[in-house]
């Protein structure tokens, strides 16, 4: 996808995602997270080295204390995966997950049994609702 295509999808889908998920789960405590697509992965973002790589090249991550959802476009091949990443991270924003809650959840659950992840994945199922196609 081109940067223009990505921006068009975000501009269309993100407000709809916010509205639907907010109506079902309420508002988050902070401002609505902005979307940042300027890094190719989490290693490049945190190291400051644009070409840095590692074993966990995810499609997205949210850093709520910074009020930002980071989308790693090289790992997002199409509209479906882009919308799923937006839904997933916006759901986490509304869950009010603190660093302590994250540590406890990571100790008590695997990724697949973590209640925060289960809820985010369940919300992803409605991705077609936010597609322009």
Place the predicted regions along the sequence by residue:
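Histidine-centered divalent metal-coordination motifs
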Residues: 88, 92
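Post-HEXXH active-site segment of zinc metalloproteases
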Residues: 80-84, 95-124
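Short alpha-helical functional segments enriched in proximate histidine and acidic residues
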Residues: 20, 93, 123, 127
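N-terminal low-structure segments adjacent to metalloprotease catalytic domains
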Residues: 1-4, 70
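Long, well-structured alpha-helical subdomains associated
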Residues: 128-133
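Active-site scaffold of zinc-dependent metalloenzymes
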Residues: 46-80, 97
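Zn2+-dependent metallopeptidase catalytic core
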Residues: 5-30
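Propeptide-to-catalytic entry region of secreted or membrane-anchored zinc metalloproteases
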Residues: 31-42
